[in-house]
Amino acid sequence: MKHNLNAHEARVIGCLLEKQVTTPEQYPMSLNGLTLACNQKTSRDPVMELSESQVQQTLDFLLKKHLIRSQSGNRVMKYEHRFCNSEFGDLKFSPAEVAVITLLLLRGAQTPGELRTRTNRMYEFADVAETEETLKTLSLREDGPFVVRLAREPGKRESRFMPLFSGDVASSLLAAGEAEENNHTLEANPRETHSFENIALEKTALEARVAQLEQQVIQLSRRLDDVLIQLDD
């Protein structure tokens, strides 16, 4: 993948993408504004409680990755993203694609119907079919894929889609997504559906979930180490 983001980096990039469109008068954003945006109680999943120092540390990492840039304001430093559609970047997305990616970064896996409803402040999709077409494009782009379809949950009519910007987790999710796409093809031809294929799909999806949880444990362990170091000081 072109970008490998941890949970905090994904939240910061998502907030910058969101506010650039929804509140352009407040963009670029200050550290305080970004911290408030990251910790919003609505339109965020999971809800985070990041300190300004944690957000600043995340900004420093993103600066090193050249995914954001800073500029001096009248009184404070302000930040804008270089994640996509920037002057020197090669990652280009349409307004519809930006809206979908932003919501996936801020709220995690969602169905096409949920995305259509929740993106209305950034982009007005005509219907769910247009949302699904945008997701399909993002999953098939030659410079991607950028999203993946997850296994459909029991009792649900729609499958959820997940962003692919997290390294090893993305690889595992992509494998699960390919299995899910094969399952959709089989559903269109019931005679070709076999129980062992469903078992393989469930196994792959579980492996992807385990990989995602392992990544979260690693991130929490690093944060705990940082806290212990600060306490020792």
Curated annotation (Swiss-Prot):
SUPFAM superfamilies the UniProt entry points to: Winged helix' DNA-binding domain (SSF46785)
Record InterPro entries: DUF480, WH-like_DNA-bd_sf, WH_DNA-bd_sf
Superkingdom, natural source: Bacteria
Regions crossing the membrane: none
Classification via Pfam families: DUF480
Recorded family membership: Belongs to the UPF0502 family.
NCBIfam families cross-referenced by the UniProt entry: PRK11239.1 (NF008413)
Protein name: UPF0502 protein YpsIP31758_2048
Native organism: Yersinia pseudotuberculosis serotype O:1b (strain IP 31758)
